Amino acid sequence: GQAASLFAGVRAERVARLALLDSLLLPDMDPDLAPKRLTGWLDALNDPPTQRSYDSYESLAERITRRNARLTPERALAIARVWGQQRPDGRIELLADPRHRMRNPILYRAAESYAVWRQVTAPTLFLDASDSPLMAAAGDEEMQRRRDCFRDHRRQIVSDSGHMLHHDQPEAVAAALLQFFDA
């Protein structure tokens, strides 16, 4: 959502509608953290994360469920089969670059995002989770300040969902997106 929202601001003429799912949650960062962040990033380049692997799709599904207790075992297994692939040795690994887990060397500066978001002209849907711990940590006032940067926006809350609302309530998320994009 962060990348899409910034693109919608700097290339406003190319975005007809923008939907953001439980998004814009990065906290503003203290500039004094920059030396430690850059040092950590450089150190990680010398020792990048490796890909985790699992005994089976079922064990990957168990890991996914530990991070999201709302998932049924069937839905977690379906996600595991999409997220994973079997290696020649039979183990399952994620179809993701493990370097994605590395921290960005640049600190997040909310004021820069606000300036870009004020350039968004597309109607914007904020599709938020009812029980997002990240949204709660950001605070209602800060989240409203961020939403208000978008000229034409509306907010819809998906009940009984956490940050991964598209996993928790895929039917409700799909219905909201279809209604918004078909308008």
Regions found by a protein language model. Give the residues of each.
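Internal catalytic or translocation cores that form aromatic/hydrophobic pockets or channels
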Residues: 21-70
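Active-site loop signature of alpha/beta-hydrolase-fold enzymes
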Residues: 26, 134, 164
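Catalytic active-site module of serine/aspartate enzymes centered on a nucleophile-bearing elbow/loop
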Residues: 150-183
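Conserved hydrolase catalytic core segment
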Residues: 1-34
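Conserved alpha/beta-hydrolase catalytic His-Asp/Glu region
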Residues: 49-110
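Conserved loop-alpha-helix segment in the C-terminal half of the alpha/beta-hydrolase fold
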Residues: 118-161
